[in-house]
A protein has these predicted regions:
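Cysteine-dependent hydrolase recognition
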Residues: 1-253
Length: 253
């Protein structure tokens, strides 16, 4: 005999939390993080965004280092972003600052960070590439990479702070590094939209800011280049037979 349930009453019982970490209304939409030296050059962009209805605020790295704790500067910045997400309900984060010099600067301070010679610090993962041929003597060529996803990945499952160092050994995002335990179970899902203007000088900041304002202040009809496109790509040599390489110059990738 087949029985069919036509109606059902469901009662949900739960305890309302004493504290809601996210306010009902947002105080800011966009927070810009940059060193104090870039503040004046960024002010036109802040004014432009506010005039467009995107509530924007600047937070300097100097302020963050004074107000927030962390094991290093990238973690201090990440704790500020977490605070801004919870207190201001921000939607976007714009990091401004790159490597100070391509010639004289040292991009990596230690296994985890580049801070000393960066206007805005970067987090290095400790993801080690395996050799292409495991039985060969080929050396590992990429011991870690820069990842700004670190700044956007604020929470683990369950709402805990995502440190990218789950085993607390002081090595962030470790995977495949000889002699180091892997950091398993990292979240890798961004909780806020984040980007970076990797500017190396005040002049570069001014140039980029002017371009952004100009782009957002004009319509497509005012931009003769708007319907033109340049595509730059490489050839993966999938069409290579011996030494006979054929290049496709007609199709789009």
């Amino acid at each position: 005999m087949l029985e069919v349930l036509e109606n059902a009453d469901i009662t949900i019982i739960y305890d309302q939390p004493d504290y809601n970490p996210f306010p009902e209304t947002s105080q800011y939409d966009l927070v810009i993080i940059a060193p104090q030296v870039f503040s004046q050059a960024l002010q036109p962009l802040i004014d432009h965004k506010n005039n467009m209805g995107v509530k924007t605020i600047l937070k300097t790295t100097e302020e963050i280092y004074q107000e927030y704790q962390g094991r290093d500067k990238p973690e201090q910045i990440k704790y500020f972003i977490k605070d801004a997400l919870e207190q201001w309900v921000i939607k976007y984060v714009l990091l401004v600052g790159g490597l100070k010099s391509m010639i004289y600067s040292k991009p990596r301070d230690d296994a985890n960070q580049g801070s000393r010679d960066w206007y805005l610090p970067v987090r290095y993962t400790n993801l080690y590439d395996s050799p292409r041929f495991p039985l060969s003597e080929e050396t590992i060529h990429d011991p870690g990479i820069i990842s700004d996803l670190y700044y956007a990945d604020i929470y683990r499952e369950g709402g805990e702070f995502e440190s990218w160092d789950h085993n607390n050994d002081g090595i962030f995002a470790a995977w495949g590094k000889p002699g180091v335990e892997n950091d398993t179970g990292l979240d890798f899902y961004p909780d806020v939209a984040l980007g970076r203007l990797a500017c190396r000088s005040v002049d570069e900041v001014k140039t980029v800011v002017n371009k952004i304002i100009r782009y957002e202040s004009t319509s497509p009809s005012d931009k003769p280049w708007f319907k033109k496109m340049i595509v730059v790509s490489g050839d993966g040599f999938l069409d290579q037979q011996d030494l006979n390489i054929k290049w496709d110059t007609n199709g789009l990738p």
